[in-house]
Amino acid sequence: MKKTALYSWHEQAGAKIIDFGGYLMPVQYSGIIAEHKAVREAAGLFDVSHMGNFYVRGVRAGEFLQYLTTNDLSKVSDGEAQYNLMLYTDGGVVDDLIIYRIDAETYFLIVNASNAQKDYAWIQKHIGAFEGVSLEDRTDELSLVALQGPMSGAILRKVFPDEDCNTLASFRFRKVYYNGTELLIARTGYTGEQGVEICLPNEAALELWSVLMKAGEEYGIQPIGLGARDTLRLEMGYSLYGHEIDSTVNPLEARLKWVVKMEKGPFIGKEACRQVELNPRYAVAGFSLDGRALPRQHFRLYNSDRQEIGTVCSGTLSPTLQEPIGTCSILREYSRPGTHVMVEIRGTMHQGVIRALPFVQR
């Protein structure tokens, strides 16, 4: 089992530790609801160093990634990042990822922890057709921390007084230096709140984490575990691999049509997407339930005639709305907001309704 460079800090802070993607990671500190509330109202600091980090380099690096992924990378300039997907030839999702364009010949990729080895092999499998393009795995050398919440800007100003990080637009990034160490600061996140994600060498991670926590004390900062990270992303309707998307799901049936640019040149999975585009059967939708029973992945959804119409992708008690919410993969004709559905939970039918996403407007 791997440990991040911040593992000792989490342990000393009394975090509950779990195995996630092959790493020992904090799932909660003070509690999921309190941590969730801190991010929505103040600031939270996340260790997401378990994510996979790759560099793709070469004169044809952009051309290669344009073929490997669904979004249009030709629209991305130096200092910009892009949410993207890698697909199998049958249209199933290999992974979702963020690609950072350092320059025309250098791209930095952040992929899901549980998929990192699979992703590396998938990229390596296709790179040979693009002469001079190289792939480097930096996962074990780099740390990634996310500072998120409405007070994150004030904390950044304290820690980086000479770098106006708050002028960064969404999905933009820049390199800054802290005590001689180069950091990559990006206006990205997984919470729906204002914030940044910071990539840096492992040896500098503990110092920066401690400095950010200290600087954030007056603003109510808290360390945030994976539990609240999940409730935060679910309130926003963001996809999580293994839930809303996986190798069996086409992105056009998972609210990700905006990431699949059919008008660009060839990419892996394009023909499969073209077929689904002609006749999509399913959609990913949000829903809420009456009562307090919680929907969980794989629970089944039914219509008023008790015919099965879908399955739950993710579910939780929304700390913001104080009601059970979830996402589901459902037959398209039932995916319109306001449609009444039922979810079977431990043998009992619970009334629910399809909701527009995101659940929480930010």
Swiss-Prot record:
E.C. no: 2.1.2.10
Statement: the UniProt record of this protein carries the keyword Transferase: yes
InterPro entries linked to this entry: GCS_T, GCS_T_bac, GCST_C, GCV_T_N, GcvT/YgfZ/DmdA, GcvT/YgfZ_C, TrmE/GcvT_dom1
Binding partners and assembly: The glycine cleavage system is composed of four proteins: P, T, L and H.
Highest classification ranks of the organism: Bacteria, Pseudomonadati, Chlorobiota, Chlorobiia, Chlorobiales
Gene Ontology molecular function terms on file: aminomethyltransferase activity; transaminase activity
Gene3D superfamilies, per the entry: Aminomethyltransferase beta-barrel domains, Aminomethyltransferase fragment, Probable tRNA modification gtpase trme, domain 1
Function of the molecule: The glycine cleavage system catalyzes the degradation of glycine.
GO cellular component: glycine cleavage complex
Gene symbol of the encoding locus: gcvT
Keyword Translocase: no
Gene Ontology terms: biological process: glycine decarboxylation via glycine cleavage system
Listed Pfam families: GCV_T, GCV_T_C
Annotated protein name in UniProt: Aminomethyltransferase
Domain of life: Bacteria
Alphabetic keyword roster: Aminotransferase, Transferase
Catalysed reaction equations from the record: N(6)-[(R)-S(8)-aminomethyldihydrolipoyl]-L-lysyl-[protein] + (6S)-5,6,7,8-tetrahydrofolate = N(6)-[(R)-dihydrolipoyl]-L-lysyl-[protein] + (6R)-5,10-methylene-5,6,7,8-tetrahydrofolate + NH4(+)
Stated family: Belongs to the GcvT family.
